């Protein structure tokens, strides 16, 4: 690992640690997403408690948190594997943010942003997979997990040199959804357009 790669990994984690869901909810006078709805500081929960406008801003910021450090590493000619580690670091920052007591989101939007520099074709496949699954099932969490599981295959078809780090990132996202998996099998998981059941 080069010093430059290490610096980018640290920057990615710190950038990921900025919880846009919490900050945007504060700015808009909305409840704290960590204690409201599904208690997840992510775009889906903000959509439930604050509507489209707030959720759209959170989604955009979360995507940029992943995209910017990976783009930076790409232009600095950091090798593909280390770019993957930078992407994982940004997602770890989102999931376990230093600035917000390590209570973060699931990392899906940040992961999408981190994978976007690989190519628009991959981004389109991932986004399309998520949208289709949501439209068919109504579950954002299920769509995220299915998309994460298919991401290594899509990556292998587009740019195989990134497959290993993408697979590592996919495992991280699925593991972060363990509570959703439990609720799904208990019949308690909430669909994207429903408010969280108390």
Swiss-Prot record:
Molecular-function GO term, any one: acyl-phosphate glycerol-3-phosphate acyltransferase activity
EC number(s) on file: 2.3.1.275
GO biological process: phospholipid biosynthetic process
Compartments (UniProt record): Cell inner membrane
Free-text function comment from the UniProt entry: Catalyzes the transfer of an acyl group from acyl-phosphate (acyl-PO(4)) to glycerol-3-phosphate (G3P) to form lysophosphatidic acid (LPA). This enzyme utilizes acyl-phosphate as fatty acyl donor, but not acyl-CoA or acyl-ACP.
Family that this chain belongs to: Belongs to the PlsY family.
Name of protein: Glycerol-3-phosphate acyltransferase
Protein source organism: Aliivibrio fischeri (strain ATCC 700601 / ES114) (Vibrio fischeri)
Gene it is expressed from: plsY
């Amino acid at each position: 690992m080069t010093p430059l790669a290490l610096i980018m990994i640290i920057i990615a984690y710190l950038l990921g640690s900025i919880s846009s869901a919490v900050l945007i909810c504060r700015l808009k006078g909305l409840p704290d997403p960590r204690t409201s709805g599904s208690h997840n500081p992510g775009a889906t929960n903000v959509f439930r408690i604050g509507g489209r406008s707030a959720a759209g801003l959170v989604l955009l910021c979360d995507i940029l948190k992943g995209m910017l450090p990976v783009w930076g590493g790409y232009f600095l000619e950091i090798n593909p594997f280390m770019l993957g580690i930078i992407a994982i670091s940004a997602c770890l920052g989102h999931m376990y943010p230093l600035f917000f007591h390590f209570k973060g989101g699931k990392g899906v939007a940040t992961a999408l942003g981190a994978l976007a520099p690989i190519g628009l074709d991959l981004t389109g496949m991932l986004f399309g997979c998520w949208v289709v699954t949501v439209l068919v099932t109504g579950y954002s969490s299920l769509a995220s997990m299915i998309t994460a599981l298919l991401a290594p295959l899509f990556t292998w078809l587009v740019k195989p040199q990134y497959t290993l780090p993408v697979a590592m990132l996919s495992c991280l996202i699925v593991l972060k959804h363990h509570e959703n998996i439990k609720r799904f099998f208990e019949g308690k998981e909430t669909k994207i357009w429903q408010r969280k059941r108390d």
